[in-house]
């Protein structure tokens, strides 16, 4: 197990993680993030000096690219199952550390006799592993650089140590001295009763402080794991710099507890929150794949605020295993509905970075989230690209407010910054939508964000309306997330049709890219109309896969124009990208064509705009490109357009959308009628008018007073209208009115009623368009209340199954269950007793494994809590911890968890440092194991300092003369 060593020092936030060298397919990946300033170098000179920096860049071109760093870990594909993988590993001197996440036949091998870190790939007899007939593929893991997407503190910024609810400006209007901004409408979603209940969110990061007072009430150990330390405690590694604060800050945004008199309120303050500790160590393809595959049928939302270097020159993305983990998650996660991956779009704006060079935010499987300042401006760190889906508020200039959240050491902070803020915000808002409708698929969630996000006051020069009526920008995607609109739409949402993929064009003809001019290549496509299982009519994601050679990659600009005329910028110039590697099968993705028709002519435009003098003979070349369309064959919203539905939804006031809380009494205030009592006044000559004119048949015995025959003085049946609106007599009252037989008047029904028996809100017989008839209360409502669902054919509110608290479409299609029941595949089933689990195939409670106290399945590795006298170890409940581990009590858990002893101990008791036996080469000294090596340069003064400060016992000098000093007395 690699030690928890701090990352290399540097001016940027801590590194994130790693790529790998594929020995089967050849070396892959783009250039590293080195350069004159070392890893993570970020030029921060004042703007007038930026051009001076550029003058120095040609010299940097001749510098060799940074070498990859290889580890002593391998990813290996072995056929035949776990036993065969163990055999193959042992035969070649490896240790099999187990299957990689949920990737069948892929295993994590470790070799203790090779260099832990090396700039050369490993050589020696152990490399014969690749020749084993059972090995189909292997990959020595290469350290990838991954950077947390927060921005560095501004020295001019002000900080406060009282981060409370009133400081959360982005959620409410509390500042009376400035213009109020609360367009994300989170409070309105809360008022509708949505707080994230029964939804599980986990943070992929450097760990979360599970005992923080604002996180502990919602902390979920079953949604947590320490991939770096290979145990179940995701707590961050503490040091003087507090560098591992990032995950704890993100977790607080999502699910900080409410009304506990501490710090803040999370957006989904009743959701469960977990943490995957995976950034505090070497991040490899194996580490990422493991992290993305932790409990996909338990965790609903994975939030990640990290990625490759945002340095304006890196092109990098997920490796082979991580890509497979993404695909497994969206196909199998959440019982087939699909795991939801939310990603921060990147902080490289100052370096001119473009987030389409980040393969994580550029993926169709992730929701890429951007940021805006409190005043609606582009933050200085924002990266533009066509794959951004939506936006939230975050930090901006030094004089603009930042985000309040939880912090390390049980504290709070008002200094959370960057797009790191935005991903967990959206994760929290999606949790509210999943509470409203737990049956949403991963694509439903993306459709909902497209449909309900809005430009609001976000300022950008590139806002455009695409061919489907959606307003979209490279800065902000479809706009600011609207939590209330999202939950209202989610509640009544019908799943979109199945996703189709169409490879619409594939052009392998090489073309030169002329300097300054534009290379245009077109593709006329039917969008696979001839194949029913591939046909795309309505677009979702559009991917352009390209291979381009070029002497200086950063000089390229790439655009894609859809048949509807929507122009997406797939790549902008990057002044710091001096690489001559070009692009190899790199996928650029755009969401700007969402909802448009796919069929027609697509145009790819490539421009080469040199930022410096370049040899004109060295031209770039488009080697090949493919157009891949994702979408549906049927309209995703059936009978209404997304744009119209969104516009209508935003026009409705909150009270109009709110379902009634209880039955209304007839005495309540009603809609005023434009009616007046009318008594006929006799006038001279009126009798003559009655005698000489023929009145309308509906006029009563008093006749009419003209000038027209229907100007009746009284009516046979009912009068309609008033003196002001010109009264008339009718035999039947029109829709929206009822007949008052005593007064012979047509009186207006209550708002929403089409027919009624009286003016009371509880006397509706049928409803106007846009309303549902609640038959039990005889009211007309825009949304059916809890316990009822909207029957679209009858336009009635019908009762849910008795076990359902909320349901959609059908009585038994539950979204929330009553107490004593649990949700399983849309049904509410009775809670199983301790020691049993719900079998969704047999629809009954089954017995857990005898080692489990509670479980999610019958297997030994499906325990949630252990039975009495059993300890949790390596996803299993065991009677005793294995060698090198000790049992430890964990707050909130009924069982003990096996924790690893100190690296020099063979066994320990009560604490990792309380050694009872030592490894070979070490001697026990009290409770510590010290090396048997002696040293000759330890004088009396040095040894006195070691002993007086108990440095050996504290393990600060465990390898430095401890034995020599202590044996010397």
UniProtKB/Swiss-Prot annotation:
Domain PLAC: 931-969
This protein's domain notes: The propeptide domain acts as an intramolecular chaperone assisting the folding of the zymogen within the endoplasmic reticulum. Isoform PACE4D lacks the propeptide domain.
Lineage: Eukaryota, Metazoa, Chordata, Craniata, Vertebrata
Gene3D superfamilies per record: Galactose-binding domain-like, Hormone Receptor, Insulin-like Growth Factor Receptor 1, Chain A, domain 2, Peptidase S8, pro-domain, Peptidase S8/S53 domain
Known role: Serine endoprotease that processes various proproteins by cleavage at paired basic amino acids, recognizing the RXXX[KR]R consensus motif. Likely functions in the constitutive secretory pathway, with unique restricted distribution in both neuroendocrine and non-neuroendocrine tissues.
PROSITE patterns xrefs: P_HOMO_B (PS51829), PLAC (PS50900), SUBTILASE (PS51892), SUBTILASE_ASP (PS00136), SUBTILASE_HIS (PS00137), SUBTILASE_SER (PS00138)
Protein name: Proprotein convertase subtilisin/kexin type 6
Classification via PANTHER family: PROPROTEIN CONVERTASE SUBTILISIN/KEXIN-RELATED (PTHR42884), PROPROTEIN CONVERTASE SUBTILISIN_KEXIN TYPE 6 (PTHR42884:SF8)
InterPro entries: EGF-like_dom (IPR000742), Furin_repeat (IPR006212), Galactose-bd-like_sf (IPR008979), GF_recep_IV (IPR032778), Growth_fac_rcpt_cys_sf (IPR009030), Kexin/furin (IPR034182), P_dom (IPR002884), Peptidase_S8/S53_dom (IPR000209)
Top class in the EC scheme: hydrolase
FU repeat residue intervals: 692-739, 743-790, 794-838, 842-887, 895-943
Superkingdom per UniProt: Eukaryota
Peptidase S8 domain sequence ranges: 168-487
Regions of compositional bias (Gly residues) in chain numbering: 26-39
Self-association state and partner proteins as the record states: The PACE4A-I precursor protein seems to exist in the reticulum endoplasmic as both a monomer and a dimer-sized complex whereas mature PACE4A-I exists only as a monomer, suggesting that propeptide cleavage affects its tertiary or quaternary structure. Interacts (immature form including the propeptide) with RCN3; probably involved in the maturation and the secretion of PCSK6.
């Amino acid at each position: 197990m690699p030690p928890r060593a701090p990352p290399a020092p540097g001016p940027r936030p801590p590194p994130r993680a790693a790529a790998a060298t594929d020995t089967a397919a050849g070396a892959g990946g783009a250039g590293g993030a080195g350069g004159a300033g070392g890893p993570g170098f970020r030029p921060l000179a004042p703007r007038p000096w930026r051009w001076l920096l550029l003058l120095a860049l040609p010299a940097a071109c001749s510098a060799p690219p940074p070498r990859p760093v290889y580890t002593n870990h391998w990813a290996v594909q072995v056929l035949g199952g776990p036993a065969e993988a163990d055999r193959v590993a042992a035969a070649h001197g490896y240790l099999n550390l187990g299957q990689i996440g949920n990737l069948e036949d892929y295993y994590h091998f470790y070799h203790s006799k090779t260099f832990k870190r090396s700039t050369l790939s490993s050589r020696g007899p152990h490399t014969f592993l690749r020749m084993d007939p059972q090995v189909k593929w292997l990959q020595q893991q290469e350290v990838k650089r991954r950077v947390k997407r927060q921005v560095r503190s501004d020295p001019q910024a002000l900080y406060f140590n009282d981060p409370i609810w009133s400081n959360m400006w982005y959620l409410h209007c509390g500042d009376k001295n400035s213009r109020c901004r609360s367009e994300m409408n989170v409070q309105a979603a809360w008022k509708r009763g949505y707080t994230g209940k029964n939804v599980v969110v986990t943070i992929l990061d450097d760990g979360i402080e599970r005992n923080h007072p604002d996180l502990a009430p919602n902390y979920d150990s079953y949604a947590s794991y320490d991939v770096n330390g290979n145990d179940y405690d995701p707590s961050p590694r503490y040091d003087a710099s507090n560098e591992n604060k990032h995950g704890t800050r993100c977790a607080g945004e999502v699910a900080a507890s409410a009304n506990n008199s501490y710090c803040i309120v999370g957006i989904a303050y009743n959701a469960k929150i977990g943490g995957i500790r995976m950034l505090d160590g070497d991040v490899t393809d194996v580490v990422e794949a493991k992290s993305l595959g932790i409990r996909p049928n338990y965790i609903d939302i994975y939030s990640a605020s990290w990625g490759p270097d945002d340095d304006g020159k890196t092109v990098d993305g997920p490796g082979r295993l991580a890509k497979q983990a993404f695909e497994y998650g969206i196909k199998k996660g959440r019982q087939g509905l699909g795991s939801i991956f939310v990603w921060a779009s990147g902080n490289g704006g100052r370096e001119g970075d473009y987030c389409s060079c980040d393969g994580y935010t550029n993926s169709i499987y992730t929701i890429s989230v951007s940021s805006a300042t409190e005043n609606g401006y582009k933050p200085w760190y924002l990266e533009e690209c066509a794959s951004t889906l939506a936006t939230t508020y975050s930090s901006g200039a030094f004089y603009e407010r930042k985000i309040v959240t939880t912090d390390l050491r049980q504290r709070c902070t008002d200094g959370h910054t960057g797009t790191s803020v935005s991903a967990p915000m959206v994760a929290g808002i999606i949790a509210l939508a999943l509470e409203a409708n737990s049956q949403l698929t991963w694509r439903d969630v993306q459709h909902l964000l497209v449909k309900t996000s809005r430009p609001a006051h976000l300022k950008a020069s590139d806002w455009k309306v695409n061919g489907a009526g959606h307003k979209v920008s490279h800065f902000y995607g479809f706009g600011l997330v609207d939590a209330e609109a999202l939950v209202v739409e989610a509640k009544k949402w019908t799943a979109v049709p199945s996703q189709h993929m169409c490879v619409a064009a594939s052009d392998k003809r090489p073309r030169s890219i002329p300097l300054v001019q534009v290379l245009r290549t077109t593709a006329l496509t039917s969008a696979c109309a001839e194949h029913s299982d591939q046909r795309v009519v309505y677009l979702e994601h559009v991917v352009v896969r390209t291979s381009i050679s070029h002497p200086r990659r950063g000089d390229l600009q790439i655009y894609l124009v859809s048949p509807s005329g929507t122009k997406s910028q797939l790549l902008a110039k990057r002044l710091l990208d001096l690489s001559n590697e070009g692009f190899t099968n790199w996928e650029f993705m755009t969401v700007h064509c969402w909802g448009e028709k796919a069929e027609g002519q697509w145009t790819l435009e490539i421009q080469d705009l040199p930022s410096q003098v370049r040899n004109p003979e060295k031209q770039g070349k488009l080697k090949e490109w493919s157009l891949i369309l994702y979408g549906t064959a049927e309209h995703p919203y059936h009978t209404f357009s997304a744009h119209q539905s969104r516009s209508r939804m935003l026009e409705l006031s909150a009270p109009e959308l709110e379902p009634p809380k209880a039955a209304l009494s007839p005495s309540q205030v009603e809609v005023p009628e434009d009616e007046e009592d009318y008594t006929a006044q006799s006038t001279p000559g009126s009798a003559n008018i009655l005698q000489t004119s023929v009145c309308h048949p509906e006029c009563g015995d008093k006749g009419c007073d003209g000038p027209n025959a229907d100007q009746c003085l009284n009516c046979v049946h009912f009068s309609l209208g008033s003196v002001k609106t010109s009264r008339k007599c009718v035999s039947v009252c029109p829709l929206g009115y009822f007949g008052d037989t005593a007064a012979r008047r047509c009186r207006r029904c209550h708002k929403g009623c089409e027919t009624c028996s009286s003016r009371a809100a509880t006397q509706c017989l049928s409803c106007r368009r846009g309303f549902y008839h609640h038959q039990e209360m005889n009211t007309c409502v825009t949304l059916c209340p809890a316990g009822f669902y909207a029957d679209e054919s009858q336009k009635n509110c019908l009762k849910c199954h008795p076990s359902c608290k909320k349901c959609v479409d059908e009585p038994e299609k539950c979204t929330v269950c009553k107490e004593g029941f649990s949700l399983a595949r849309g049904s509410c089933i009775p809670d199983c007793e301790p020691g049993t689990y719900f079998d969704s195939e047999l629809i009954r409670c089954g017995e857990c494994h005898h080692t489990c106290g509670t479980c999610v399945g019958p297997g030994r590795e499906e325990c949630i809590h252990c039975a009495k006298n059993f300890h949790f170890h390596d996803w299993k409940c065991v009677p005793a911890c294995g060698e090198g581990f000790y049992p430890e009590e964990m707050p909130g858990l009924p069982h003990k968890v096996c924790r690893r002893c100190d690296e020099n101990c063979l066994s320990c008791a009560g604490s990792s440092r309380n050694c009872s036996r030592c490894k070979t080469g070490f001697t026990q000294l009290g409770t510590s194991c010290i090396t048997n090596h002696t040293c000759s340069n330890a004088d009396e003064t040095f040894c006195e300092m070691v002993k007086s400060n108990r440095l050996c016992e504290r393990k600060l000098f465990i390898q430095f003369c401890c034995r020599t000093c202590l044996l010397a007395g």
